[in-house]
Amino acid sequence: MASLLGTSSSAIWASPSLSSPSSKPSSSPICFRPGKLFGSKLNAGIQIRPKKNRSRYHVSVMNVATEINSTEQVVGKFDSKKSARPVYPFAAIVGQDEMKLCLLLNVIDPKIGGVMIMGDRGTGKSTTVRSLVDLLPEINVVAGDPYNSDPIDPEFMGVEVRERVEKGEQVPVIATKINMVDLPLGATEDRVCGTIDIEKALTEGVKAFEPGLLAKANRGILYVDEVNLLDDHLVDVLLDSAASGWNTVEREGISISHPARFILIGSGNPEEGELRPQLLDRFGMHAQVGTVRDADLRVKIVEERARFDSNPKDFRDTYKTEQDKLQDQISTARANLSSVQIDRELKVKISRVCSELNVDGLRGDIVTNRAAKALAALKGKDRVTPDDVATVIPNCLRHRLRKDPLESIDSGVLVSEKFAEIFS
């Protein structure tokens, strides 16, 4: 892999310049009233009716309207958050090639299922993940929709937008960059899932729903730093949403659902606690990060960081060409991904590796196939080779192996040894 990535990203990747990060959805609540449309953001008529033989209520969306003065206003809102906090350039990250490759492959193919990054303190895990925001491509979303609904694909539409499309209504569309949402350790369940005002719903027939972080992360990236320290009840919420692609908020018999399909990226220090196996298996790939030992590289990292801290704008301008090239290569890889082929013989060998390593389930097989195709697309090829599989398979399987407390060999080494045995 070192030969592929090197110590600088400039040797391999690069991209169409998309400098404007996406904006936050409106922080104001979304108000719903039975049989009536109102409000200035997103409005929905809600019918509240008692279920048979039950004293509670069920809330169903009946109709929706979106009022926007002009598309220019929405675009302005998306552009208003230009570089509020300077981000360290991805191309300037020294070393950590395994982590960078896993992140890029997930941007190329979000269906890989995310990355879990584990490593020592101060090794650049959070810096690298957040630097990815400059490289994220643009997507089309329905203007004014808090769930970043896709205007074409029903699988990525909120309920309200889908009903409007089914009625033949033309929905306003804008282009914005893929969103990266940080999930803080201290977040409450209501902040993550969204909030329903139960009192208004039951007494006045008015339901105010404010979308949470999962709504904002739909069709984007959800980043959890120190994910191994996350509260168990929030881990359960992430598991449910990652498995189903939908987030359902239930409060006193009142229910509302919205799409929540996101790339889950987590980072943490294994010394601070292990991750629950149920959550670990949800990550498509696993990257291990170690401290740089080479003295020259350490000096270079310190000097580069000092330059960035003293003048972030000039430092980012220094790497603009490399960033643009990397963006261009990512966009090309995303466009060509569907045409990349993988031979059946390689698929069979991948499944043999998974079977002989006693990997539970089929996620390992699926993710390895997807990651190998994404790597081939990144290299500009239309067919997967054994070298592509060899590069990604340790990251796809190491966290799925059953733990042996007496085993001192790294799981990635075991995967590589089994790969060499079967592919030789």
From Swiss-Prot:
Organelle targeting peptide span: 1-60
Instruction: Point out residues bearing the modification N-acetylvaline.
Output: 61
Q: Which residues carry this modification: Phosphoserine?
A: 355
Positions with a binding annotation for ATP: 119-126
Q: Which UniProt keywords apply?
A: Acetylation, ATP-binding, Chlorophyll biosynthesis, Chloroplast, Disulfide bond, Ligase, Nucleotide-binding, Phosphoprotein, Photosynthesis, Plastid, Transit peptide
The catalysed reaction is: protoporphyrin IX + Mg(2+) + ATP + H2O = Mg-protoporphyrin IX + ADP + phosphate + 3 H(+)
Pathway given for this chain reads:
Porphyrin-containing compound metabolism; chlorophyll biosynthesis
Q: Which EC class is this protein assigned?
A: ligase
Alphabetized GO MF terms: ATP binding; ATP hydrolysis activity; magnesium chelatase activity
The record's statement on gene disruption is: Homozygous mutants are chlorotic lethal when grown on soil, but can grow on sucrose-containing medium. Dwarf seedlings that exhibit reduced leaf temperature, wide stomatal aperture, and a pale green phenotype.
Which GO biological process entries does UniProt record here? chlorophyll biosynthetic process; photosynthesis
Q: Where in the cell is it found?
A: Plastid, Chloroplast
Give the matching Pfam families. Answer: AAA_lid_2, Mg_chelatase
* Induction / repression: Not regulated by light.
Provide one Gene Ontology cellular component: cytosol
Q: Does the keyword Phosphoprotein apply?
A: yes
* Disulfide bridges in this chain: 102-193, 354-396
What the record says about activity regulation is: Redox regulation; active in reducing conditions, inactive in oxidizing conditions. Thioredoxins f and m mediate the reversible reductive activation of oxidized CHLI1.
Q: What is its quaternary makeup?
A: The magnesium chelatase complex is a heterotrimer consisting of subunits CHLI, CHLD and CHLH. Interacts with CHLH and CHLD.
Name the family. Belongs to the Mg-chelatase subunits D/I family.
Q: What function does the entry list? A: Involved in chlorophyll biosynthesis. Catalyzes the insertion of magnesium ion into protoporphyrin IX to yield Mg-protoporphyrin IX. The magnesium-chelatase is a complex of three subunits, CHLI, CHLD and CHLH. The reaction takes place in two steps, with an ATP-dependent activation followed by an ATP-dependent chelation step. Possesses high affinity for ATP and may play a major role in chlorophyll biosynthesis. Does not bind abscisic acid (ABA), but is a positive regulator of ABA signaling.
The name this protein goes by in its record = Magnesium-chelatase subunit ChlI-1, chloroplastic
Name the source organism: Arabidopsis thaliana (Mouse-ear cress)
